[in-house]
Amino acid sequence: CKYLASEEEALDAIFGYTTTLDLTALDVLRKNPRYLTRAKSFDTFFSFGPIVVTKDEVAHVDELEVITEHNGAVFSRDFVRNMHTRPLELVRFHSDYQTLHPGDLI
């Protein structure tokens, strides 16, 4: 799909939701903020899953709580509704610049 005009169209394009681990090498990023792509591109710096929750299992994605933990210690917690750019807007935005296919991860 391409050029999704609304959040409703974006929702139609979503299969489900999963967890991700998105790492950034801050030492690389501090050297030059333009190195964001390099700072995120090392082997093992992105993983997802292992579970995908289908969209019909989530009544309101904005009510999901996101918690970052390491060895049982909570580092951050917040709700999807407080994200700077929420999931439906992300899907709509990316559809303006690339064709989205079934199975794509955003």
Residue ranges and their predicted role:
Residues 1:
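Catalytic and substrate-binding clefts that recognize carbohydrates or anionic sugar/phosphate headgroups
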Residues 4-17, 28:
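N-terminal accessory regions of nucleic-acid-interacting proteins
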Residues 8, 26-106:
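Catalytic-pocket segment enriched in acidic/His residues
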